[in-house]
A protein has these predicted regions:
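Alpha-helix N-cap/helix-start motif at helix boundaries, enriched for small hydrophobics
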Residues: 78-80
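Short helix-to-coil transition segments within interhelical loops
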Residues: 70-76
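Hydrophobic alpha-helical transmembrane segments of membrane proteins
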Residues: 1-64, 82-214
Length: 214
């Protein structure tokens, strides 16, 4: 298990560095947009970081590592679990970047209050895990190339939400993916549901592991 995680860590550093750079740039833009309470760029940066497990799985399937791994002393749960651990690492990274960006924004903009900060952090976590929750099982079942259709659907859904948000605001700014009136209990419920779906997604990926090669 440790060796698998080290392999994924090396690949993430080698192949996904630009994703981290892009996320940092998005966070920087998000600090500026937060002057009007618009957190879309910070949330979307989390979505980018959440794509790292999919990127690593794509390289595994392209290089036939999934076939070679049959000779390793590792179970399906461990092989699949590594990608989900990478997803959780992406979540921690996204939340850390978002907290830093929100801290800077809170120092400069009156519109950034504690309620908006908490709501934004929940939204970052939700979008960071969203892509892995949906796309990893599809990739293990149908292969990365076919699962990319799901990726395009998610991007389209986020774009649609962005369009609705723009239409709902007179100043044409994208504000929040979630209603600003949602309660703390509602945000906690969303966080619990997202983590539960992430765990169920792992079980589904384990069940479908190896199907894409058949």
């Amino acid at each position: 298990m440790k060796g698998l995680l080290l392999k994924d860590a090396y690949q993430a550093w080698y192949y996904a560095k630009m994703v981290v750079v892009a996320a940092v740039v998005m966070m920087g833009v998000g600090v500026i947009s937060m002057m009007n309470g618009a957190n879309f760029f910070i949330v979307y940066a989390g979505f980018l970081l959440g794509m790292m497990p999919m990127t690593l799985l794509a390289y595994d399937q392209t290089s036939k590592f999934n076939e070679y791994s049959a000779a390793l002393p590792a179970t399906k749960e461990q092989l699949v679990g590594c990608k989900y651990i990478v997803g959780l690492c992406g979540l921690v990274l996204a939340e850390a970047f978002a907290a830093a960006a929100l801290g800077v924004a809170q120092l400069h903009w009156v519109a950034v209050d504690s309620a908006l900060v908490i709501s934004t952090l929940v939204q970052v976590g939700m979008t960071t895990l969203l892509s892995s929750t949906i796309l990893l099982p599809l990739s293990y079942r149908f292969g990365y190339e076919k699962a990319k259709v799901g990726f395009y659907f998610i991007v389209g859904a986020l774009s649609a939400l962005m369009g609705f948000s723009v239409a709902a605001n007179e100043d044409g700014l994208v504000r929040n993916l979630l209603p600003q009136s949602i309660s703390s209990l509602g945000l906690l419920s969303i966080a619990v549901v997202v983590l539960t779906l992430y765990a169920l997604s792992w079980r589904l990926s384990v069940a479908w592991y190896g199907r894409a090669e058949q």
